[in-house]
Amino acid sequence: MKDDNLYGEGWCWDDDNPVLSPLLVSRKDAFVGRFVDMLREAGIVVDASLGEARKPSDAFCICHRFHTMDQVLLRMLKDSDNLYAEAMFYQLAASSGNRPATAKDARSVVRHLVTKLGLRADGYAFADGSGLSLYNYVSAELEMAMLKYAYRNNNIMLHLRPSLPIAATDGTLRHRMSGPFTNGNVVAKTGTLTGISSLAGYCKSANGHDLAFVILNQGLRHTRNGRAFQDKVCQELCRP
């Protein structure tokens, strides 16, 4: 489904690019070697050249393994797993119907959503799926629009809310916001780059209203300062 590019897009020439081959084993591009080793251990000898290529038209499926969207979302959001985020990015690309799925296709899908939200897609840049690329450019306005769009669509929230980290409970918020107003009352996605920290999600106010929020802290010398600020904002949003 994905293109045969070994690496993703959106990286500088001197970056340590993560491998994004569709056939990863323990996050390493070692599927073919591992597969052959297991065949040998089972007493099966393969007398042929081995490698990765397009499936022949006369090939047939022996075993089919897949993960549900919820399984991917849970790992991607709760644990902030960048590999899973890239996998979701190319899943978006596949939804366009193009084969093989490319980063360009994924960006097209995202831009279509931005336009649907009433914003100008050419005002933003989407380089990768994980958000690690320095070539990404988004705003709090865009993230808020997406949060509101998701909230108003139950078929999205049904999958999104259970996948977000919960304050003082699990995921990347497990050790944050343990106070009486925020504990279990904030669900949000964290984001961290050098000098940057962000938090975006939902919380419930004292009157029972659901609130969406987006906090982007930039120019930080210490990430903990940004996180402390975010936690305090959430505390005030939830305070009676």
Residue ranges and their predicted role:
Residues M1-N154, L158:
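A small/polar active-site loop signature that marks catalytic segments
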Residues F89-P240:
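Small-residue-rich helix-loop
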